[in-house]
Amino acid sequence: MNLGGNRFVQIGNGMSNIMYTDANGAVRWEQISPPAGFPQQQRGRGRGHVAFGLPNTLDWLPGFVQATPNSITISNMGGIQISSAGVITAAINSEQNSWMLSSFNPSLKLTRQVTLTDFCDPTAERPGLPIIRLRHHLDAIGSSPSSTPPGRNPQELDEAWAALSELSVSGRSDTTGLRPSLLSLTFLVASRSGEYSDKAAAEAVRAHVLANYRDRRTEQRLDRFGEYLQAMVRTHVFPHKHMTVFGGLISHVIQDKLASLTAVAGGVQEGARTNNSAVPRSSVYVPACAFLDVDHELKLGDASAKFVYLIFVYSQRLRREGVRVYVAVSKFDEVAFEDAVSFLFHKARTESAIRGTEGADAPEPHPNAALPLQELSSSRCEPRCPPSRLNNREFTNALYQWAPDLRGRPNRTSCMYAAYIRLGAIASDPPRTTRRSERFGSVDMPVVWLENVRWDPQDWVECSY
């Protein structure tokens, strides 16, 4: 470092700032010399004087700055500000103020997974397509006996998967450990294309999968995968419980029927480079039949930043179960979005509440199945328990023991009509969404492009009547 003709170098301000606040919220700053330090605790009680100060910048100099008669060596140049010629001031503490250096640099999180191409062929898709990760099928089959309502056969789920696995690349009795662990959004939509209101766009998605997945058994695989989804709803092993968000596709490496997919799991989709030199950047796109602008449907306007959601909509009519999936944008957060879903899918909500218990073979209700609240309250012989003793078994054991039989009665799972998860957000205001027809091989498919999508998947939220 060349200091020129300067004889004095100042590192650190030699002072500490202290902020005082009074009961009225007024703020004043004071500076004290380094030996005095700064208070660590609140002065007084309530909203009294609160002291807060940044540590002296000289505190972190040992190990970072080495001074000799001929030179000054700075080990870590991160956050060093040269305020004037020959005068170096350590302006930013590397530990406490690192956010000032990184807050404007968007982070990116990539994920990679190896999968069979049964349900996701990356060569037929473009970068930006949402990809879904599937849990192991034994997890769903193992939970079906306990979740299936009485009167329904939990083995139907096992049989549906067995029929689907017969068309798998690895076969039904696979011992290699490889499985189709990833599911493309287009394959999922194509498997239930008959349930969408936009019939033409949905049929275009199915035609795209049949034409570009390059497997003569693709049509059978679509039909059996749709039947597998129906069996999951019938046994109350809902699909969303065994699916998570993988991210937005950006690149892939494929050999035969085995592919390694890389996707954006966190951060802006456009921030990652693809392996296509012609299109180095990608935006998120979804099939037009599976896109839903919630604010537009509710006539709330479009001028605001929006969240991006993935929605599963269920219909629990016995033997005619329905599964639809949508990618929706809305300015509502996770809590308020549930009311919007309830309003938009009121038909599915009502039908699931009415028909969710169809086929239940439950025993006849016992005459004393209802809680005899009036009789208990009017009888002086029945024991009582004060609220302060509810955790004491000596008092609660003497109370009337009521164990209702809920078999065959509506419950939370029998009335479930939807589930959604927040995928991320569109930071631009207003958000840029464009619908146009794209060419996939020999098929034209209408899609909706979403720009500046920042991936940040959250947890599933279930909707019941």
UniProtKB/Swiss-Prot annotation:
Gene Ontology molecular functions: DNA binding
Keyword Endoplasmic reticulum included in the entry's annotation: no
Cited Pfam families: Herpes_VP19C
Entry GO CC: host cell nucleus; viral capsid
A GO BP entry: viral capsid assembly
Family of this protein: Belongs to the herpesviridae TRX1 protein family.
Function: Structural component of the T=16 icosahedral capsid. The capsid is composed of pentamers and hexamers of major capsid protein/MCP, which are linked together by heterotrimers called triplexes. These triplexes are formed by a single molecule of triplex protein 1/TRX1 and two copies of triplex protein 2/TRX2. Additionally, TRX1 is required for efficient transport of TRX2 to the nucleus, which is the site of capsid assembly.
UniProt name for this protein: Triplex capsid protein 1
Species this protein is from: Equine herpesvirus 1 (strain V592)
Name of encoding gene: TRX1
